[in-house]
Amino acid sequence: MRHNSAGRRLGRTTSHRIAMFRNMVTSFLQHEKITTTDAKAKELRSIAEKMITLGKRGDLHATRQAAAYIRDKKVVTKLFTEIAPRYTERPGGYTRIIKLGIRPGDNAPVSVLELVEAEMKPKKAAAKPAKAPKAAKAAPVAAAAAEEAPVAEAPVAEAPAAEETTEA
């Protein structure tokens, strides 16, 4: 029977699983976002939140504990100086999982794990200017073509004068 066995095995040996999650949490904290399968994202979330909690503590022992798990010293520094101060008032829940659908190659459910207060770009504001009417687009193209024609003639007129000076 399955009692008190927390965590997912993910079809890997213990050493492989630990190494994979150490690499993933390092990449996640470095880029503040990671795309992976749903099962890995759910496991990575708990590890990443523990690392951010260590960063919030901020003492020497917490720094050493984080450095023992995170593979890159620059990422540990980023965790303690940039990431953790953002969440001083927040008592947990530093990450979110956004499900993307399935991966075409193997039909695996894929999701994005990202930090909650990361800067989000507004999607609707960028979409509205891109949808301009076709008539409005045609007029600037014609005007641009008219402007380019005189510019193209000017260098041609100067070219013979340049040749005459080189012949003389």
From Swiss-Prot:
Ranges annotated as biased composition (Low complexity): 127-144
Gene3D superfamilies: Ribosomal protein L17
Positions of disulphide bridges: none
Gene Ontology biological process terms from the UniProt entry: translation
Coiled-coil regions listed in the entry: none
Keywords on record: Ribonucleoprotein, Ribosomal protein
A molecular function (GO) term: structural constituent of ribosome
Record InterPro entries: Ribosomal_bL17 (IPR000456), Ribosomal_bL17_CS (IPR047859), Ribosomal_bL17_sf (IPR036373)
GO cellular component: cytosolic large ribosomal subunit
Region (Disordered): 123-144, 149-168
Highest taxon in the source lineage: Bacteria
Pfam family of the protein (one): Ribosomal_L17
Subunit organization: Part of the 50S ribosomal subunit. Contacts protein L32.
Family: Belongs to the bacterial ribosomal protein bL17 family.
NCBIfam families in the record: L17 (TIGR00059)
Protein name stated in the entry: Large ribosomal subunit protein bL17
Organism, scientific name: Geobacter sp. (strain M21)
Gene name in the database record: rplQ
